[in-house]
Amino acid sequence: MPIGSITVGTPGTAVAVATSGNAITAVSFRARTDNTGAVYVGDSGVSSSNGYRLEPGDELTLSFRETIDLRRFFVDADTADDAVDFAGVAA
């Protein structure tokens, strides 16, 4: 089960959730409660205008019929050093 945290150092710059392949069937993202702004989950082009918005403490859970590579997910944030925790269900 891939588990980790992603910190966005520079707002407007998407950060990869994983750098090596992890086949998953589900994944949960949770914005840290101590974040000062929203974070966004999406693909490599994620931004505040097209990502799934998570306010501090919000959680997003996605399930898939087929396996998907965790490297497809990226995170961006409104505020530098805000973070997202994630946990994937390995295939």
Language model features: what each stretch is:
Residues 2-23, 80:
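Surface-exposed ligand/attachment interfaces on beta-rich extracellular proteins
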Residues 8-16, 49-66:
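Short, solvent-exposed S/T- and G/P-enriched segments that are highly enriched in secreted/extracellular
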Residues 22-24, 31-37, 81:
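Short proline/glycine-enriched turn/loop motifs at strand-loop junctions of beta-rich domains
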Residues 25-27, 65-82:
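Noncatalytic modules at the cell exterior or secretory-pathway interfaces
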Residues 30, 41-42, 54, 63-65, ...:
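Beta-strand-rich, repetitive solenoid scaffolds
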Residues 32-50, 85-87:
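Short, surface-exposed beta-strand/strand-loop-strand elements in extracellular ectodomains
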